[in-house]
């Protein structure tokens, strides 16, 4: 039973670490998306900024902003799906009550 408990704890720790990594990526994604939106807003306000950022944005996003948004939506759906899977697995692990056999009372 102790080995099963250690394996469950190890799996729980791995899942928790994966959750933290996904959460970090999601935060970065939102930061990048906000910066791109800011650049687009600034570009719309000033013709000079428009010319300067046009080439930068084209180099970064050759498929255009619409293509980036489509890819971002796909990625976001994947992340949400992974979060849901992670949540289900964590609930399963939490539902498993660890059973320890008291020392000296083993079956033979």
From Swiss-Prot:
Keyword Chaperone in annotation: yes
Coiled coil: 69-97
Disruption phenotype: Mutant is severely attenuated in virulence.
Induction: Expression is regulated by the two-component regulatory system SsrA/SsrB. Expressed when residing in the host ileal loop, host macrophages, and when in an acidic environment. Repressed by methyl-3,4-dephostatin.
Compartment(s) where it occurs, according to its Swiss-Prot or TrEMBL record: Cytoplasm
Protein keywords: Chaperone, Coiled coil, Cytoplasm, Virulence
GO cellular component term of the entry, any: cytoplasm
Domain of life according to the entry: Bacteria
Main location: cytoplasm
Function: Functions as a type III secretion system (T3SS) chaperone, which is required for SseB and SseD accumulation and secretion. May have a direct role in secretion of SseB and SseD, or may facilitate their correct folding, for efficient secretion and function. Required for survival and replication within epithelial cells and macrophages.
Subunit field text: Binds to SseB and SseD.
UniProt domain comment: The N-terminal region is dispensable for binding and stabilizing SseB, but is essential for export of SseB to the surface of the bacterium.
The protein, known as: Type III secretion system chaperone SseA
Source taxonomy: Bacteria, Pseudomonadati, Pseudomonadota, Gammaproteobacteria, Enterobacterales
Gene: sseA
